[in-house]
């Protein structure tokens, strides 16, 4: 499983670097898209928490407000997040990942409620959830790259 966490860490480093390089358009929604660069990044954090923690019956380390703003099917609201909120999301890219790896290694995820993804896969274990989450975040990183072309 270490490789799965390493892959996710690299994807998130790439996302953070991309966000920093594109600060001036992080909240723009390009023509043909429904969401911004920032929304896609925050959405990845929320989805990881839902897939790994909520579906395993464990407490998420993010608050419900973040979930409500960035879960699947949402769109950016009218106001730009505050500097504090942006910093929190940047921090969560790695703190949420580090906590997931720690919790996995400590055997926290003993139960898992099967979940059918919109991708067409049914997840039945934490290992499958982590693997799928990597696919999901790779897709969203691809969206980020396409948004600035």
Where are the language model's segments positioned?
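Hydrophobic alpha-helical core bundles mediating ligand binding, dimerization, or RNAP-core interactions
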Residues: 8, 12-15, 19, 93, ...
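Intrinsically disordered, low-complexity regions
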Residues: 1, 13-18, 23, 83, ...
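Surface-exposed helix-capping loop/turn segments at secondary-structure junctions
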Residues: 21-27, 102-113, 149
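Short, helix-capping/interhelical loops that line the mouth of catalytic, cofactor-
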Residues: 1-3, 49-99, 103, 110-114, ...
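Short, contiguous alpha-helical
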Residues: 5-9, 16, 25-72, 115-149
